[in-house]
Amino acid sequence: MVIILLVIFTLLTFITWINIDKAALRITTGTISLLLLLATAILMAFNFNNHYGMEKVTKTTTHEIYSAGGSKMPAGMLMAQALGSKSDNYVLVYADKEDGKAKPHFTPDQKHIIEAVKKSATYKVADVDKATVTTKTTRWEWRNDFFKLLFAVGGEGHSLAKQTSVVTVPKDTWVVMTPAQAKQVQKQQAAAATDPAAAQAQQAQMQAGVQAKVQAFMQDNPNASAQEVKDYTAKATATLMADAMKTMLK
């Protein structure tokens, strides 16, 4: 609509100043049409530069994510690759489903670089039970139908203003590492596997540690159900494995 008004007021300005013979009428109508033209141009500029007629609407979503190491590994793993040396912005590797394949998330889209610079992703380690990703998306939306009718020309409505994603992982049962560190851990695990005696001793140590934790839990919680004991056993196993992986990274 604003483009149509701009064309109309431009034509009116031209016609009134050129084709009207009476000076008083020409000046009056010409001035009015010129002012309307300027007002329309200013409104258009305000909308383009300052999103006049629009407001920011924020939507937040949270869902569970799963280990990049697969569901068979007790400890969870998140791979994080920093984008640049100083920015708190990462490409994060994890699985969207429990039995799903791990894949990179939040990789900048080089084909849509303007939108890409408005997006960021980071992670934090917290005292939580499950790993989640929370995405906060802020978009420019029309204040009402009038502004939409007036300015909606190039699909400005629903345009992205900012998007931030935060992956939160449990501090005890998950490990965050870079892709290079993940390869380092894999090499160490492969080297340990070539020594059956060492591998068996490590496994026995792990089992003993889990058993000790479970026994302590049952002593502190004598009325715990079988499911609660099972859940705690899984958590204790994940915690000890995560500790072992963190030790490998030191």
Q: Which ranges hold each PLM region?
A:
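Alpha-helical transmembrane signal-anchor/signal-peptide segments
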Residues: 47-70
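Short extracytoplasmic
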Residues: 65-92
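Extracytosolic and intramembrane catalytic regions of membrane-associated proteins
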Residues: 95-209, 213, 217-250
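Membrane-embedded alpha-helical segments of integral membrane proteins
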Residues: 1-24
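Membrane-interfacial entry segments at the cytosolic side of transmembrane helices
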Residues: 24-33
